[in-house]
């Protein structure tokens, strides 16, 4: 049960909210990009702390705040994570070379031999969100990951959802052990983090009209 109050924390009743103009908010949200090329400079602990100081404000069911984060603070640790993902992929190839993880793994292993990181895209930092398996709403972790991506964007830090990392940490005991994720914890997802190597364009990407069923 959350310690901050389930209905209306006293501090919230006294808070002063600054107005955020609609145009500024829309511009911020629409200019978010998935970053897949990073500078090698890792994010400082100060920058990471500032990002997660915003992330902690993500809403959770009953204000339980169940999300725990595992964050690699330097490129060396992140490279160890990449190597462990490759180990998992080799295991998948050995077990069933026709499975989807094996087919994807063969391609990523070949890229790694060429010196290309196709798994975490050379990002110097990574973050994994976990919640207790006993928590009824693992979606809280996904919401927190979305806050992470947006908080990073607000500070000029690039982020991208780490699908390969998420798959590996959910299925490979060796990686879970390295990340100190317990058996009673559910992995909600992961993201790569770092300063963009190329400044993203400020133009809005094309999107299809939103699919809405009006009742």
Question: What residues fall within each predicted segment?
Answer:
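Iron-sulfur cluster-binding cysteine motifs and their immediate structural context
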Residues: 1-8
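Extended interfacial segments that mediate partner engagement and assembly in macromolecular machines
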Residues: 10, 14-49
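C-terminal helix-cap and adjacent tail motif
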Residues: 13-19, 110-114, 186-215
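Small-aliphatic-rich amphipathic alpha-helix that forms the alpha element of a beta-alpha
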Residues: 50-55, 125-127, 131-177, 191
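Short loop-to-beta-strand entry elements in the cores of soluble alpha/beta enzymes
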Residues: 64-73, 164
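Short, surface-exposed beta-edge/turn micro-motifs
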Residues: 66-67, 123-126, 187-188
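Glycine/small-residue-rich phosphate/adenosyl-binding loop
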Residues: 71-141
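A glycine-rich helix N-cap at a beta->alpha junction
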Residues: 89-102, 177-203
């Amino acid at each position: 049960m959350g310690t901050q109050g389930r209905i209306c924390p006293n501090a919230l009743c006294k808070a002063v909210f600054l107005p955020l103009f609609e145009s500024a908010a829309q511009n911020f949200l629409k200019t978010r990009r998935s970053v897949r090329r990073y500078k090698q400079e890792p994010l400082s602990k100060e920058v990471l702390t500032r990002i997660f100081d915003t992330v902690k404000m993500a809403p959770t069911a009953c204000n339980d705040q169940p999300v725990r984060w595992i964050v690699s603070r330097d490129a060396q640790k992140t490279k160890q994570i990449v190597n462990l993902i490759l180990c998992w992929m080799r295991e998948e190839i050995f077990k069933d070379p026709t499975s989807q993880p094996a087919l994807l793994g063969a391609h990523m292993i070949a890229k790694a031999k060429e010196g290309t990181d196709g798994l975490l895209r050379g990002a110097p930092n990574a973050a994994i969100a976990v919640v207790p398996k006993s928590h009824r709403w693992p979606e809280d972790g996904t919401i927190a990951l979305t806050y992470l991506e947006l908080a990073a964007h607000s500070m000029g830090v690039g982020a991208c959802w780490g699908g390969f990392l998420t798959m590996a940490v959910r299925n490979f005991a060796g990686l879970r052990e390295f990340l100190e994720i317990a058996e009673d914890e559910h992995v909600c997802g992961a993201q790569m983090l770092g300063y963009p190597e190329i400044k993203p364009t400020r133009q809005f990407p094309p999107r299809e009209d939103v699919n809405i069923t009006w009742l």
